[in-house]
């Protein structure tokens, strides 16, 4: 029997799903993170997981985004052959109208991150359209839809290899994961696609990430196929790398490994790998012609009773900070920042460097200040600023030396690790790099007491803001001597776990 899917039902269902995943983690993710928190032995990593879980509950209660990067929308549709759409526009246009409405919803405006003309103009589309949409035609009279929002930090760490038929997939994964740094915001998942062609392997990897986390169940009952054996082997060995939550070293780097495969040409073995971050966001629903889809929200009582103890953190007055005080900070120290910080990320840094190269004066005085790599969500209601978690710091590495040396900037705040060139620039300038927890954007935003755009307003969420913060939680990631916790801690925990020999990269 033919099923009629009405245009408004499709649009509203997509809109509702995008709002839903902006503030609700999937329940399986919450449970897996809770177990990771209970198991974790490294205090820094345990604190990071605690902040992610506390932020998750705050977002569920307040209906505000888990992460300021509310992602590029991925939509997977399985359309029954006996379905007829009652549309006045194309199916793509109807889905994108749902995206538009979802991101512009006045009660919970989501950050628009999608840029048109990617090679040249890179102009923000303002409503996060278009989505990346995939279709399958299947038997039946219903439409199954999966909606996901994929942030740049994890998506940018996607990997593809055209392996030889005899190459080891496990060896490739273990060689590749350390090169991804911590910008993908672990703990999360790795989706792995094996076979097909290059684009098929990547599609399989992305689709695998939509599956439910069930590694603990698999470990309890034991593997029942070679694929399950492979999942367990990769899971155990990746965690044995000791990368840990946010790259701080620890027992849990991945919560699960998901693998999908497809037949491939005899001459090769394509393998794609895509991580899902601590802001895992996806929802699944079905349209059967009866109206708008309903997605079951997790219950607040399902969230763990986790607290974050800040009593051992040092309070810092950024408006009166001295070089001597910064010299005393050690990697792993937790700080509570108070005072003035400026924001600036990719586009702002590019513009500042262009101005410096042209001999122009910058619109803000950064001498003795800290700059926070963030693109916040617009505020709603009485908020000072919307969710404002850190963006991946390595994208600013190429600007770091020039900005430090030209402005007298004291330090930077961002997400995850810094590359060798940035660490060297930090050391040479006796600066410092502080790390805020990725995936805890709403929690971080509560520390912002004042916010105003002070430069580059045309850049939208990439404008430079002046923030006044109160007890903003960060950790020292690179000290004035150039010692990086992301370089030292994983080696320590890899040795403690003891399953994989620690090899000094300098010896290779």
Language-model regions: role of each:
Residues 163, 205-209, 272-276, 289-291, ...:
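Short, solvent-exposed amphipathic alpha-helical segments in soluble enzyme
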Residues 328-329, 335:
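Short, well-ordered loop/turn sites that connect or cap secondary structure elements
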Residues 311-321:
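Short, structured beta-strand/loop micro-motifs enriched in basic residues and often containing a Trp
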Residues 249-257, 264-265, 278, 446-508:
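C-terminal binding/interaction regions
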Residues 209, 213-242, 246-249, 343-475:
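Feature captures the catalytic cores and cofactor-binding loops of soluble hydro-lyases/lyases
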Residues 335-337, 341:
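Generic structural signal for buried aliphatic residues
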Residues 1-192, 197-309, 405:
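Non-transmembrane, aqueous-exposed alpha-helical and coiled segments at domain scale
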């Amino acid at each position: 029997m033919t099923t009629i899917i009405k245009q408004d039902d499709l649009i509203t269902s997509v809109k509702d799903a995008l709002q839903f995943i902006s503030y609700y983690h999937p329940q399986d993710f919450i449970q897996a993170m809770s177990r990771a928190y209970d198991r974790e032995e490294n205090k820094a990593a345990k604190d990071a997981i605690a902040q992610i879980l506390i932020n998750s509950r705050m977002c569920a209660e307040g209906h505000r985004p888990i992460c300021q990067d509310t992602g590029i929308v991925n939509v997977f549709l399985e359309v029954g052959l006996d379905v007829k759409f009652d549309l006045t526009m194309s199916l793509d246009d109807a889905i994108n109208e749902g995206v538009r409405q979802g991101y512009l919803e006045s009660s919970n405006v989501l950050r628009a991150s999608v840029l048109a003309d990617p090679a040249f103009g890179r102009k923000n589309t303002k409503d996060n359209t278009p989505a990346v949409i995939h279709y399958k035609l299947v038997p039946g009279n219903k439409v199954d839809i999966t909606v996901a929002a994929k942030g740049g930090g994890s998506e940018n760490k996607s990997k593809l290899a055209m392996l030889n038929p005899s190459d080891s997939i496990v060896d490739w994964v273990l060689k590749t994961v350390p090169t991804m740094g911590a910008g993908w915001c672990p703990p999360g998942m790795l989706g792995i696609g094996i076979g097909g062609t290059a684009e098929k392997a990547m599609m399989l990897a992305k689709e695998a990430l939509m599956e439910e986390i069930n590694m603990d169940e698999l470990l309890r009952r034991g593997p029942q196929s070679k694929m399950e054996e492979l999942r367990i082997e990769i899971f155990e060995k990746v965690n044995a790398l000791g990368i840990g939550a946010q790259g701080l070293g620890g027992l849990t780097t991945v919560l699960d490994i998901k693998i999908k495969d497809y037949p491939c040409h005899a001459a090769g073995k394509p393998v794609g790998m895509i991580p899902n971050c601590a802001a895992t966001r996806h929802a699944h629903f079905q349209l059967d012609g009866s109206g708008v889809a309903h997605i079951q929200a997790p219950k607040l009582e399902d969230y763990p009773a986790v607290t974050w103890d800040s009593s051992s953190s040092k309070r810092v007055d950024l408006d009166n900070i001295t070089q001597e005080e910064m010299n005393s900070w050690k990697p792993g120290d937790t700080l509570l920042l108070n005072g003035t910080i400026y924001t600036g990320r990719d586009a702002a840094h590019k513009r500042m460097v262009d101005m410096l190269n042209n001999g122009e004066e910058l619109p803000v005085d950064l001498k003795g200040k800290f700059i926070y790599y963030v693109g916040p969500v617009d505020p709603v209601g009485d908020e000072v600023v919307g969710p404002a978690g850190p963006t991946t710091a390595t994208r600013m590495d190429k600007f770091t030396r020039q900005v430090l040396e030209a402005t007298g900037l004291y330090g930077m705040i961002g997400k995850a690790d810094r590359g060798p060139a940035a660490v060297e620039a930090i050391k040479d300038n006796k600066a410092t790099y502080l790390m805020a927890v990725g995936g805890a954007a709403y929690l971080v935003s509560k520390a912002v007491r004042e916010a105003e755009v002070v430069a580059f307003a045309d850049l939208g969420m990439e404008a430079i803001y002046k923030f006044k913060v109160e007890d903003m939680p960060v950790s020292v990631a690179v000290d004035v001597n150039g010692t990086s916790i992301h370089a030292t801690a994983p080696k320590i925990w890899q040795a403690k776990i003891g399953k994989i020999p620690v090899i000094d990269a300098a010896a290779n």
